[in-house]
Amino acid sequence: WDKQTGAWLIPATNKCKAELDQLTYYVRHFEPVQWGTVAQSQTEEDVAFQIPEMPELDGDHGLKVQPYPYQLQGIARGLQLKRFINGDDMGLGKTLESIATINKADAFPCLVICPNVVKINWQREWHKFTDKKAMVLTDSVRDSWPFFWQTGMNQVFIVNYESLRKYFVRRITKAEKWTLKDVEFHNTIKLFKSVIIDESHKVKSTATQQTKFCKGIASGKEYII
């Protein structure tokens, strides 16, 4: 920092020039930077964003209970988007909206991936809201669960994050530092038409096993919530 000139001095190297060119690019292409003291600074005008109105659901919602009007709109929007994050606040009924969206779309079989402690709750909610039968995957049906879909006994299958490898992964071809392309899944994952990923913050890191498994299983599915 040069006190006399009031400027920063940097070495005249190619590396510094490249970084300076990049900085100049951002300054030119984004909002102009206004320099001055706090007293001299001007308040930028507020930017107003127009949020589109939510659609209304056409036809019967297909549930055993009557959803709230905002939930019906959420279901309608989910049917439009097909792949989306349900960002409703806690307690507003995200589970109902997700179940209703899959049920209305008839996107079965459906796989629900969730924390271990809420598997039974998801099963109860499916039975409470719809006439579909939900199964929690256990060791007793590790290899036979597709039979329950093929015979019409179950339409929904529920699994916790930690068990994805057990039920859906045939093998991983590398011992260390493996990526999704090194994972061989069982062909049974192709059966699913939809996937619900509950508590999806658990798959925010692309470096974790469960994120890679979720991505591989959900890839190509018409409905992903």
Predicted regions and their residues:
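SF2 helicase/translocase NTPase motor core
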Residues: E44-R77, R83-N86, L92-Q210, S219-K221
